[in-house]
């Protein structure tokens, strides 16, 4: 499907988002009646019984004016070593409560217990005066017929979540000292799409990696917890760095400036997850090439333009430098006065701009829109700080990171290039749709073109902000 946007920043963004919203709504309507299959678990028998506070159990009609409590008797046979998939906690009254139910686990598949249920007995043994560890061990070691008495949580059950998040960091629960149970954690990598199953716990959500082939969920740090963790580490590192420096805090000057954002704001940006939705195939309008200086982006860009002039186009930059004899205004560059360029920068008409040898250079949103209006793909080779600006429904970019060769003879220059590339990758990898090791223009072109076509012809995960 080819989607077109109108002119101008605001109008283009709005119309493109509307088109993607319509596409998403159509997708939801077509798939709303497809139930998710869940692996079967041993059947559980439940029976509701009532008590008026005495030891006698019966029906609610025999309450004799006393407060009636409903107690549920849950019975099932446990014949394997599979964990039940629940965690317990003691509330303020020292009552044993179901704290968490793991999606895909035995209890979840049975539907026999719910978060907030109060457990009274396990196999006829009262849970009073037991620690959480003792109770968890009791559940783990039970075999054969299991009988649990609970006071059901009377709060309404919320419908299952339909939320998907793209991970913006790597996570290994075995290396996490904060997680309450390392074995229950979910390992994932940057770029993995995680279906969020439960987020009742403000610190630890439950999720599963989409496409992993398993129904079982694991614990993941919530966005709030992860952002707190990263901010704490960053603050600690900055404090240590300042205390070690005889000059205190140093200021860094950058010659590259970005419209609407600055490098200072970028440094304060803490990433965790990004909510995404799955859309049917649609055309990506912009191809963005990211990489360290000297990695070969220009060679790849020029080869794309030369091999596919009917498909790809590069937006001519604006500049305040004098026009040379062999240059055509509007083809090689747009030549403007310093006053005009300064005015347009103030009006946020540039997606990126900077200066070189006393002259200003920059790329306008308008020139990118003109390429889209010709039904062509705009190629941008920009600084990584600009990614958050171009990653919008308006531009619908496919972002490719170009990494240095891993086959060339080792040299000091190559070592520096790899160091610069790793610095970009570690900071901006959560934006990348594709990473390519540039072992040659021809090989890189083949990989890039195949991946771009695949992205435009198959369902895609996109930021939820592109749709709503």
From Swiss-Prot:
Q: Which Pfam families match?
A: Guanylate_kin, PDZ, SH3_2
Keyword DNA-binding assigned to the entry: answer is no
Question: What does this protein's UniProt record list under function?
Answer: May play a role in the regulation of neutrophil polarization.
Its family remark reads: Belongs to the MAGUK family.
- Every Guanylate kinase-like domain range: 284-453
Q: Where in the cell is it found?
A: Membrane; Cell projection, Stereocilium
Report what the protein is called.
Answer: 55 kDa erythrocyte membrane protein
CC annotations in GO = cell-cell junction; centriolar satellite; cortical cytoskeleton; plasma membrane; stereocilium
The record's Gene Ontology biological-process terms are: regulation of neutrophil chemotaxis
Whether Membrane counts among this entry's keywords is yes
Domain (SH3) spans: 160-230
Gene3D superfamilies, per database record: 2.30.42.10, P-loop containing nucleotide triphosphate hydrolases, SH3 Domains
- Look up and give the membrane topology term: Peripheral membrane protein
Q: Which GO terms describe its molecular function?
A: signaling receptor binding; transferase activity
Q: Which organism is it from?
A: Gallus gallus
Q: Which UniProt keywords apply?
A: Cell projection, Lipoprotein, Membrane, Palmitate, SH3 domain, Transferase
Q: Report the superkingdom from the record.
A: Eukaryota
Domain named PDZ is located at: 73-154
**CDD domains with a match to the protein in the record:** GMPK, PDZ_MPP1-like, SH3_MPP1
Q: What is its main location?
A: membrane
Q: Which residues form a coiled coil?
A: none
**Its encoding gene is what?**
MPP1
């Amino acid at each position: 499907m080819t989607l077109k946007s109108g002119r101008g920043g605001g109008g283009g963004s709005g119309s493109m988002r509307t088109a993607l919203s319509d596409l998403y709504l159509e997708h939801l309507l077509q798939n709303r009646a497809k139930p998710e299959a869940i692996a079967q678990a041993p059947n559980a028998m439940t029976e509701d019984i009532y008590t008026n506070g005495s030891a006698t159990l019966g029906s609610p009609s025999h309450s004799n004016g006393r407060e009636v409590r409903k107690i549920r008797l849950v019975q099932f046979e446990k014949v394997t070593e599979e964990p039940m998939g629940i965690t317990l906690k003691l509330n303020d009254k020292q009552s044993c409560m179901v704290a968490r139910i793991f999606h895909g686990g035995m209890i979840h598949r049975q539907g026999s217990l719910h978060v907030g249920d109060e457990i009274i007995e396990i196999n006829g043994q009262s849970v009073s005066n037991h620690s959480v560890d003792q109770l968890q061990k009791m559940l783990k070691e039970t075999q054969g017929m299991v009988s649990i008495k609970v006071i059901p949580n009377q709060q309404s059950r919320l419908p299952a979540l339909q939320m998907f998040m793209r991970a913006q960091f790597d996570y290994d629960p075995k290396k996490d000292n904060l997680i309450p149970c390392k074995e229950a954690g979910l390992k994932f990598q940057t770029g993995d799409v995680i279906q969020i199953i439960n987020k009742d716990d403000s610190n630890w959500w439950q999720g599963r990696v989409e496409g992993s082939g398993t129904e079982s969920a694991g614990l993941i740090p919530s966005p709030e917890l992860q952002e707190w963790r990263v901010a704490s580490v960053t603050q600690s590192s900055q404090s240590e760095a300042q205390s070690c420096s005889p000059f205190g805090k140093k200021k860094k000057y950058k010659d590259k400036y970005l419209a609407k954002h600055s490098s200072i704001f970028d440094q304060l940006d803490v990433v965790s997850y990004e909510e995404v939705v799955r859309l049917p195939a649609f055309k990506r309008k912009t191809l963005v090439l990211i990489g360290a200086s000297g990695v070969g982006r220009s060679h790849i860009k020029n080869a794309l333009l030369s091999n596919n002039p009917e498909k790809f186009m590069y937006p001519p930059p604006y500049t305040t430098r004098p026009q040379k004899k062999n240059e055509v205004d509007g083809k090689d560059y747009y030549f403007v006065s310093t006053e005009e360029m300064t005015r347009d920068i103030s009006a946020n008409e540039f997606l990126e701009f900077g200066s070189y040898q006393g002259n200003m250079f920059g790329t306008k949103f308008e020139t990118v829109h003109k390429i889209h209006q010709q039904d062509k793909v705009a190629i941008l080779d920009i600084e990584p700080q600009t990614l958050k600006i171009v990653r919008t429904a308006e531009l619908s970019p496919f972002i490719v990171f170009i990494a240095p060769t891993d086959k060339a003879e080792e040299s000091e220059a190559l070592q520096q290039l790899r160091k610069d590339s790793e610095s970009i990758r570690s900071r901006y990898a959560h934006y990348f749709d594709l990473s390519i090791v540039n072992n040659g223009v021809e090989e890189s072109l083949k990989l890039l073109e195949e991946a771009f076509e695949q992205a435009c012809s198959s369902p895609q995960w996109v930021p939820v902000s592109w749709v709503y």
